Structures are given as C-alpha cells and as structure tokens.
C-alpha cells in the first residue's frame, strides 16, 4: 500500500505539468499527425512494417541461439544425431589411409571398439592415467594426403584403430 501511495504522489505532479504544457505548445503539421496517431491508436503502415522487421530479426537471432523453432527453422539437433555426424566428420577427415604417427615409434595393439572416434578416445584415456605430460614424439597427426603420408601408409597397418603412440624411453 505504501509503495502505491508513493507512486501516486510521484506521478501526480508529472501529469499536471504535462497537461499544462500541452495547452501552451503550438504544434506543427508533423507533430499534430504524430499526436493524433498516438491518441487515436491508428498505426502508420510504414512505421509498423519497420517495427515488424526489427522485431523479426531480433526474434530470429534470439530463437536461433536458443534452439527454438521459428518459421520453419528446425531446432538444434539431438545429441545422438550430433554424435553420429561428428563420427562421420572424423571418418571423412581420416579418409582411407587412417592415422599417421609423427616419428618412428609405432605400436600395434588390439582394440575392442574400432568405431570412428575410438583411437582418439582411447588415447585421451591413456593420457589421463599418466602423471607426466606427453612429449612431442607421442603426438598423433591426421593424414591429410601429403607425400610423406603416402610413403608411411605402405608400412603402416590399414586399420586406424590399431595404431597407438608408444611412450618414449629415456
């Protein structure tokens, strides 16, 4: 009740001053049209179109970021489909040659899962178990079709899931 009384006391003088000022002002032709439009509630078509365009663009930006559907735009895909697409991208990057390892150390191991991201997942898990950071010889590079990869692919096994970096010995 007290905030309502304070609000009424603040608004009262403001309303009385604006009604007095309105009588004293002389309006031009443009000002009168704006006042009558605002008082009657009849919108001007060109202004309404511009406001709608502004509102649409901001709405589209917001809902696009939030993943909601706006006028035929599909929401963000589920995690399952995104995972499948990520695996597909990894397969496309690897191509038919698989992985190449920098340096001369190679180790063939049998892995249970030979899916598209199995090597990367297993190498991350093996690095988490170590207390020391990996050195430059343990760096795994993707083959992107260079001449060096053509020579090393003849010696390396065809299955990319069997290639793991060997820890260096001091």
UniProtKB/Swiss-Prot annotation:
Residues 107-170 are annotated as: Disordered. Its main location: secreted. Residues 17-54, 67-170 form a propeptide. One of its GO terms (molecular function) is substance K receptor binding. Transmembrane segments: none annotated. It is found in: Secreted. Residues 123-140 have a biased composition (Polar residues). The keyword Secreted applies. One of its GO terms (biological process) is inflammatory response. The modification Methionine amide is found at residue 66. Residues 1-16 form the signal peptide. Keywords: Amidation, Cleavage on pair of basic residues, Hypotensive agent, Mast cell degranulation, Secreted, Signal. The keyword Ligase does not apply. One of its GO terms (cellular component) is extracellular space. Belongs to the tachykinin family. Tachykinins are active peptides which excite neurons, evoke behavioral responses, are potent vasodilators and secretagogues, and contract (directly or indirectly) many smooth muscles. Hemokinin induces plasma extravasation, mast cell degranulation, muscle contraction, salivary secretion and scratching behavior. Increases sperm motility. Induces potent analgesic effects and may play a role in pain modulation. Promotes survival of bone marrow B lineage cells and of cultured LPS-stimulated pre-B cells and may act as an autocrine factor required for B-cell survival and proliferation. This is Tachykinin-4. It comes from Rattus norvegicus (Rat).
């Amino acid at each position: 009740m007290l905030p309502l009384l304070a609000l009424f006391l603040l608004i009262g003088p403001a309303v009385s001053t604006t009604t007095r000022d309105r009588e004293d002002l002389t309006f031009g032709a443009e000002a009168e049209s704006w006042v009558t439009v605002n008082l009657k509630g009849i919108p001007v078509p060109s202004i309404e179109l511009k406001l709608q365009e502004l509102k649409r663009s901001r709405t589209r930006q917001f809902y696009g970021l939030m993943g909601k559907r706006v006028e035929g735009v599909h929401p963000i895909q589920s995690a399952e489909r995104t995972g499948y697409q990520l695996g597909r991208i990894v397969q496309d990057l690897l191509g038919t040659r698989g992985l190449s390892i920098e340096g001369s150390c190679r180790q063939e191991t049998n892995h249970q899962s030979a899916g598209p991201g199995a090597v990367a997942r297993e190498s991350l898990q093996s690095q988490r178990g170590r207390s020391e950071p990996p050195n430059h010889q343990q760096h795994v590079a993707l083959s992107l079709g260079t001449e060096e990869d053509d020579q090393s692919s003849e010696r390396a096994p065809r299955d990319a899931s069997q290639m793991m970096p060997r820890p260096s010995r001091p």
